[in-house]
């Protein structure tokens, strides 16, 4: 017999507080701020049994419609610190970096893809790309995908 799960998207304001506290305890544990379940449940104010009862059944919903998810592609020269410079420009614009992938340099050039969430960005994506293109060693850039 198959156990099929059903999922519902529910506004947090109507959920029993225990669910919100379980999610908060999971977040605290995942961040490493607290190392064990006892301390985490004590901090958020729930019992261990409530935590264990719900921990595998409640998850936060990350709203990607708040901001678009954009995948950027760069070809960069093999300079020490060039990836760090690109990441710093993205961070300065308050974009949320989701993934970074850098290939091994071949003939002095490396391909880099960075996926960002733009919901909290403080400037236009075009301005960000113009800023990144001014970094010495950035040879090519493009937007690969938008969601």
From Swiss-Prot:
Residues 71-146 form the ACT domain. InterPro entries: ACT-like_dom_sf, ACT_dom, UPF0735_ACT_dom-cont. Disulfide bonds: none annotated. CDD domains: ACT_PheB-BS. Pfam families: ACT_4. Belongs to the UPF0735 family. This is UPF0735 ACT domain-containing protein Cthe_1377. The lineage of its organism: Bacteria, Bacillati, Bacillota, Clostridia, Eubacteriales.
């Amino acid at each position: 017999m198959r156990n099929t799960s059903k999922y519902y998207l529910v506004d947090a304001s109507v959920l029993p507080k225990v669910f919100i506290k379980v999610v908060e305890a999971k977040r605290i544990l995942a961040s490493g701020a607290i190392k064990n379940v006892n301390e985490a449940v004590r901090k958020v104010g729930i019992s261990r049994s409530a935590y264990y009862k719900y921990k595998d059944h409640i998850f936060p919903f990350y709203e990607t419609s708040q901001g678009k998810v954009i995948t950027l592609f760069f070809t960069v020269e093999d300079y020490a610190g060039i990836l760090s410079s690109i990441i710093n420009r993205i961070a300065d614009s308050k974009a949320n970096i989701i993934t970074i992938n850098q290939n091994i340099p071949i003939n002095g050039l490396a391909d880099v893809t960075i996926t960002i969430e733009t919901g909290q960005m403080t400037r236009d994506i075009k301005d960000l790309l113009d800023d990144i293109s001014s970094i010495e060693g950035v040879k090519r850039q493009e937007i690969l995908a938008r969601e």
